[in-house]
């Protein structure tokens, strides 16, 4: 009977050891999920405490943030971009048209033989 009792005790101790190891693993995983602790040294410097450094994970940046935002808001943003492009294009056409008119009027005035139509009685022009 002794060997059977010893076998049962060994099995129980092995099961208890396995359960304790699983509990420790769960606790470590829970600790890893939290934010890393840091000790403030003042002046914006931080020091990670010594010990198990695997616990203190640095948060990874969100690499696909912009892509995600464009996917979620893509269609309204695309419409706004098209409207903005059309509006800006129209404004540019109007400005170019005004500029052409001004340039054309100045060039025509220089070519034409008619005197300027504005009245400046107090001004004079020295002609050679």
Swiss-Prot record:
Residues 1-44, 103-128 are annotated as: Disordered. GO terms for molecular function: metal ion binding; molecular function inhibitor activity; signaling receptor binding. It is found in: Cytoplasm; Nucleus. Keywords: Apoptosis, Cell cycle, Cytoplasm, Metal-binding, Methylation, Nucleus, Zinc. The keyword DNA repair does not apply. The modification Omega-N-methylarginine is found at residue 50. InterPro entries: BEX, TF_A-like/BEX. Signal peptide: none annotated. Residues 117-121 are annotated as: His cluster. Zn(2+) binds at residue 125. Belongs to the BEX family. The histidine cluster (His cluster) and Cys-125 mediate zinc-binding. Interacts with LMO2, possibly leading to regulate the transcriptional activity of a DNA-binding complex containing LMO2. Interacts with OMP. Regulator of mitochondrial apoptosis and G1 cell cycle. Regulates the level of PP2A regulatory subunit B and PP2A phosphatase activity. In absence of reductive stress, acts as a pseudosubstrate for the CRL2(FEM1B) complex: associates with FEM1B via zinc, thereby preventing association between FEM1B and its substrates. This is Protein BEX2. The gene is BEX2.
């Amino acid at each position: 009977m002794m060997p059977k009792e010893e076998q049962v005790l060994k099995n129980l101790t092995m099961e208890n050891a396995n359960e304790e190891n699983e509990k420790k693993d769960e606790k470590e995983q829970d600790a890893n999920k939290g934010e890393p602790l840091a000790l403030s040294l003042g002046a914006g410097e931080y020091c990670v405490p010594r010990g198990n450094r695997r616990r203190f994970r640095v948060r990874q940046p969100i690499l696909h943030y912009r892509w995600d935002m464009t996917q979620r808001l893509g269609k309204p943003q695309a419409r706004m971009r098209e409207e903005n492009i059309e509006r800006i294009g129209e404004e540019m056409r109007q400005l170019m048209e005004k500029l052409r008119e001004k340039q054309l009027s100045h060039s025509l005035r220089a070519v034409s033989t008619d005197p300027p139509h504005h009245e400046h009685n107090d001004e004079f022009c020295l002609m050679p």
